[in-house]
């Protein structure tokens, strides 16, 4: 199935090592175990990084392969893909929608160029989001100590 960038895996390993231990067994990304797979009507969708027990997905979008809207106009034909930027955006949007509708998982998109410029802040934002979702999950559970 799909390709992945080395940069994405560096980010995902860094997040994985900083996230709470009790979430790690429900974490999926290419180099750890596999990408998270959802099948709908015999169409397979792979997701870059998923923590399924807090319903969080991170998609690491390469600026070229996913036609970063800060770099492409909707009618641009994207190098290497030979597709219109708007078609790539529609496909990516549908993939995110499928995950939400079929698994109730929300998606955070990280653009490669943003990551390159701002690694530390993006990583902190992601870890904070993971902790926030984990706290919500724990506070809404029926288990009491």
Model-assigned labels for residue ranges:
Residues 1-145:
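Nucleic-acid endo/exonuclease domains
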């Amino acid at each position: 199935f799909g390709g992945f960038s080395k940069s994405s895996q560096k980010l995902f390993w860094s997040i994985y090592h900083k996230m709470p231990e009790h979430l790690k067994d429900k974490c999926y990304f290419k180099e750890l175990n596999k990408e998270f797979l959802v099948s709908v009507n015999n169409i397979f969708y792979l997701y870059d990084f998923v923590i399924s027990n807090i319903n969080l997905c991170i998609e690491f979008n390469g600026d070229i392969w996913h036609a970063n809207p800060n770099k492409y106009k909707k009618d641009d034909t994207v190098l290497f893909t030979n597709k219109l930027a708007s078609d790539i955006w529609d496909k990516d949007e549908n993939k995110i929608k499928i995950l939400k509708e079929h698994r109730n998982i929300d998606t955070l998109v990280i653009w490669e160029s943003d990551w390159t410029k701002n690694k530390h802040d993006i990583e902190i934002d992601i870890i904070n989001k993971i902790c926030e979702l984990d706290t919500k999950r724990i506070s809404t559970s029926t288990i009491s100590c």
